Amino acid sequence: MEHTYQYAWVIPLLPLPVIMSMGFGLFLIPTATKNLRRIWAFPSILLLSIAMVFSLHLSIQQINGSSIYQYLWSWTINNDFSLEFGYLVDPLTSIMLILITTVGILVLIYSDDYMSHDEGYLRFFVYISFFNTSMLGLVTSSNLIQIYFFWELVGMCSYLLIGFWFTRPIAASACQKAFVTNRVGDFGLLLGILGFFWITGSLEFRDLFKIANNWIPNNGINSLLTTLCAFLLFLGAVAKSAQFPLHVWLPDAMEGPTPISALIHAATMVAAGIFLLARLLPLFISLPLIMSFISLVGTITLFLGATLALAQRDIKRSLAYSTMSQLGYMMLALGIGSYQAALFHLITHAYSKALLFLGSGSVIHSMEPLVGYSPDKSQNMVLMGGLRKYVPITRTTFLCGTLSLCGIPPLACFWSKDEILSNSWLYSPFFGIIASFTAGLTAFYMFRIYLLTFDGYLRVNFQNYSSTKEGSLYSISLWGKSISKGVNRDFVLSTMKSGVSFFSQNIPKIPANTRNKIGSFSTPFGAKKTFVYPHETGNTMLFPLLILLLFTLFIGSIGIPFDNGVKDNRILELTILSKWLTPSINLFQENSNSSINSYEFLTNAISSVSLAIFGLFIAYIFYGSAYSFFQNLNFQNSLVKKNPKKSFLDEVKKKIYSWSYNRGYIDFFYTRVFILGIRRLAELTHFFDKGVIDGIINGVGLAGFCIGEEIKYVGGGRISSYLFFFLCYVSLFLFFIP
């Protein structure tokens, strides 16, 4: 087994040959390389598949052997300082290796067809292969300096891929926004690394964990300084995993191609922050203040992400806020010390979210011939609807991914989310209430996405499908030349002027002869004639969806407890995942539930599933075919008092959707406080520099020049000037003599 571990360093390097080959090909023989560009997908997939097989072999050995292997190379700079580089293979590493390689392979296969007509096909495969290499290097790193090196490479690749279509100004601004926002977290991470190096004189994980086990409990070092450095490390994870308040880059990152959105949200960039916290949890767990702060940030993020997803119209941005919320669940689990539940949800969410993003890409691909290739139209759920008849395979896979994320058994995310909910209730009722309520919201907004996309009838002719620029805050423009002047505070997803109501209680009566001319947002009463219809994507794009569907159906089984005997009338818990994670859990002696009561499990499961079903039901009432049915019968108006004033419930509903659609006004706040504030400070500094500093210096120079000119004039050899000053001096002398 040790012989196999010795070659684990090859895994991150396997995708590099194809990257270098494509680079040399584009440089030396560009015409031939571009003409044969589809061939380059095969070696990219092949090499990553070899890495996956190697990773799977290591994982099997981890499960059977339960050991940790670390290999180091030491580079001595001088007698007092040396750098150590190496790789670490433990359960966390093996989990991430399988996650990255499996999702990465499926994304590469999907991209071969999705990007086939794009001029940047080769450039895309170079970027995405290097992205996989960077993430594989990150998870195998044995110390903080290596993690930071690959951390920056991951950020660079995300910058390149988010701005892949850099000729579009909005995409160029989006990658800049992601880069600048992550700079805040990366700066904190670097300061935290330097701080711990100053404390311990080492960057190795074993030395940091020694602090956690020995020095901190015995007050061997300054706990305040250690807490500050740990907070700075956590700041890096906050930015990379899109946690509040550094989450604003994530929805705008959807400007990149859809396959890279799947990779970023499933297995690479946003997973890097969770991985960093999981790797350093033995250190954080000895700092109760930091653990409380982590759980608080996770709780805020999971609730905020769910509320911001409620009213989004862009299918990819809705899924992006869903990712933000689910990452909040993982952060909460790590904050309360539930290491196994956090990693379990990381695994299940990765496959479910990859399925959803690739499914959304299939939907976008099928809509583009109808509405055009502008993301404002092809990704707008308002113009979709009724796609279940045209893309049945995509619809089935998307529905399974949706139900998984909603927490419906026996799909993957049910098992992991239920474990997080149970542990959060045990840790704090406050966290349990927020997490459980958000689980219901998750079911609501996820089923909303499904219904608006696949239910009802096709709405390609729907008018007023997007709000005006003056009416809403487009945060992506904050990083460009223009800045939105206002915020739409009264926006609700409705079209009042056209007589079509989305959430209005006062629904106008629609004459029979006009029902075929007006389309409801949720489900139109009739579809206009069109000669072009959406079509199912090719087999190359459907194959990854079907494989991810299998993962979504069965990956949850690794966390299902099996009977391992009875002790004190309780069934001892044994899962594949717990056996897999045994060495890592032993590092910090996680006080997890070593046993499980079947009654407690059923109680928790019934409550969580009930919340999910309730959310699904409410979403169907508002967005499904039932809404159109009630609207035609004028059913809702019979339940509401008819008065000219809007009801209180309608106002609350309006404010909630205005909050959600405008991203909680957080981007607006950042614009006013930070961006415009920094610009005004820069203008004030420029004025002070030019007006005051330069004014004083120029004034001194001018005064010296004038004095010199006067002296030159006086000493110019004129007798009259000499007599004048002589008389002046004599007069002053006589004046002061008493």
Curated annotation (Swiss-Prot):
Keyword Translocase set for record: yes
One annotated Gene Ontology cellular component of this protein: chloroplast thylakoid membrane
GO BP, one annotated term: ATP synthesis coupled electron transport
Domain of life: Eukaryota
Residues annotated as transmembrane: 9-29, 39-59, 89-109, 125-145, 147-167, 185-205, 219-239, 258-278, 280-300, 327-347, 354-374, 396-416, 425-445, 542-562, 610-630, 691-711, 717-737
UniProt keywords, alphabetically: Chloroplast, Membrane, NAD, NADP, Plastid, Plastoquinone, Quinone, Thylakoid, Translocase, Transmembrane, Transmembrane helix, Transport
Main location: plastid
Reaction(s) catalysed by this chain's protein: a plastoquinone + NADH + (n+1) H(+)(in) = a plastoquinol + NAD(+) + n H(+)(out); a plastoquinone + NADPH + (n+1) H(+)(in) = a plastoquinol + NADP(+) + n H(+)(out)
Family the UniProt entry places it in: Belongs to the complex I subunit 5 family.
Quaternary state and interactors: NDH is composed of at least 16 different subunits, 5 of which are encoded in the nucleus.
The protein's name in its UniProt record: NAD(P)H-quinone oxidoreductase subunit 5, chloroplastic
Organism expressing this protein natively: Sorghum bicolor (Sorghum)
Lineage: Eukaryota, Viridiplantae, Streptophyta, Embryophyta, Tracheophyta
Gene, per the UniProt record: ndhF
